[in-house]
Amino acid sequence: MNLNLRRTLHATTVALVVGVALAACSGDDASAPQDGSASSEHNDADTQFAQMMIVHHEGAVEMAELAGQTSDTPEIQDLATRIAGAQQPEIDLMTGWLNTWGEDVEAMDHAGMDMGGMDMNGMSQEEVMAHMETLEGAEFDAQFLEHMIAHHEGAIEMAEAEIEDGVNEEATSLAQTIVDAQTAEIAEMEGLAAAQ
C-alpha cells in the first residue's frame, strides 16, 4: 500500500474514533430534557407543587440571605449560604418546568391551596421577616433556626404530597430530594439550637 494512502487512512480513522469518542462523552443525550425542563407529562399535583414550592423556596432564600447578612455565627452563615445555594437553582428548575408545561408560574389561588407551613408559628412570611430584621446576635440566631425549621417542615409536607400524588418523574424526584435534604438540615438546625 502506498505510504501516503496509509497515512491518510490512519489519520482518517483516528479522526473518526476521536470524533465518536468526543460525541459519546459530551453528555448531550437527545432524549434528556434540555434547559432543566421536565417532560410534559404532569397533573394538577405536579403543577401545584412547582407553583407553591417556588413561593416557599423564595421565602427560605429571603430568610437565608438575611441570616447571611445578620448572623455572627459561622455555622449559621454557612447553613444560610447552603440553603440559598440549593433552593435558588430549584426555583429556576421548577420555573422551567411550568413554562414547558404551559402552566402559570404563579399559582392562581394561594388562598385555596395548602401552603404546607407557609405560616411559621402563626406568622406570615412578611411578619417573620419584619420581626427578624429587628433582631441581632443570639436572639436573631434562635429565631432564624426556629422559623427555618418550621419552614422546612412545611416544605417536607408539600414534597410528601407531591411524591404521593404527582405523576411527573422529575418533579417527584425533586420532591424526594427536598425531603431528604431538608430533613438533614432540620437535624442540623436542631443541633445548632440545642448548642446555644
Annotate the PLM regions.
Residues 21-24:
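C-terminal motif of bacterial Sec signal peptides marking the signal peptidase cleavage site
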Residues 27-196:
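All-alpha RGS (Regulator of G-protein Signaling) helical domain and cognate RGS-like helical scaffolds
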Residues 14-18:
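Hydrophobic helical h-region of N-terminal Sec-dependent signal peptides
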